[in-house]
């Protein structure tokens, strides 16, 4: 294939992108300086560990510009090969997180830890492990301090003593990864290809089951079954080194269930902190917040530490709320439990919500799990319990496209309207939802359609300092009074 010469349009876009980067860099440096001078805990928007609005906008703009530069200057064929093999980046990170490499490095000298020492503790042959770590160093995760020594950098350090974040890496790289491997076949199959049934996905093919993912996660099985699914899924890597002991009934819980619950806390901390500060929770006083399908209560856990007047009810399947009540909250916020500020209720969100007239009904990462018909049922079950003053907050990704959406802000031209590279995780999660549960990350128009079908009306999309937004919905007759 002959090399194609660049056009005047390409040159113009390159200059425009360079100017955006130059201007944005100045904003980032100014915001970094302001952060360094500010007293600890006095962020510009009262949000520890959260960037100012100006810094957040600058971050996503410069990441979008980096993506545009990559598009403009890369050799097309080389770029195709690069993207085709990027799954190895994810696998290398999974190996490092699963073997707790960041924690091993944190316990060593600042100058780095020798690969032989890392290898001995991680139980991976040193030359192979060194190649994996060099790969990660090349994409800015970890740093190499000598020919055979490695240390954490600011990126890998995020995993040190961070079980929830580690769990998220495990979540998407265990059965989630195996499901993605089966996705091409599933899309072409005459039965599963056009289906949005939660039990007809690539994930069922991967783990060799007819159960839904939630039913499978809650199974109790013989220990040896954890490594012998009968399908394409090999199980959690560490199980190769030893299976858990049988419990009194001769069975064990799947480790993926606990990983799932903990990962929701980890993901919430990354993308959910903004929702604690970018919505006016303080104005609600002692309002009752019902977290529908709330898992172990990860988001109320965040809110409870910032707004001590708020009250919470966490609703989900029995084994999940049990994990929140008995393991997560006693460790993370026992005071809220003792004060009765949080309750855990077993509930299926397809049934009419048992809590009537709550101030806020909160749906985080629920609707993206389900296709449209299921979502309308979930929303209608909440609507029937809402009072005139009630509000529904949907915490989900609101997908923009590279050509933009009239309901969402766009990046400056010539950058992709949806901020391109900045949204890579959002689109990746959309395909993960497709692979595992036939779920969907939706556009504003798609959310409006769901709400209308359920007898609700979209009031506002809260643009938060996150890739995940808050969609506020109300009963139609109250929309004019809010």
Curated annotation (Swiss-Prot):
GO biological process: methylation; secondary metabolite biosynthetic process
GO molecular function: O-methyltransferase activity; protein dimerization activity
EC number: 2.1.1.-
Domain of life: Eukaryota
Active site feature: 368 (proton acceptor)
Pfam families named in the record: Dimerisation, Methyltransf_2
Uppermost EC category: transferase
Expressing tissues: Specifically expressed in conidia.
Effect of gene knockout: Resulted in loss of trypacidin production.
Similarity annotation: Belongs to the class I-like SAM-binding methyltransferase superfamily. Cation-independent O-methyltransferase family.
Identification of the protein by name: O-methyltransferase tpcA
Organism name: Aspergillus fumigatus (strain ATCC MYA-4609 / CBS 101355 / FGSC A1100 / Af293) (Neosartorya fumigata)
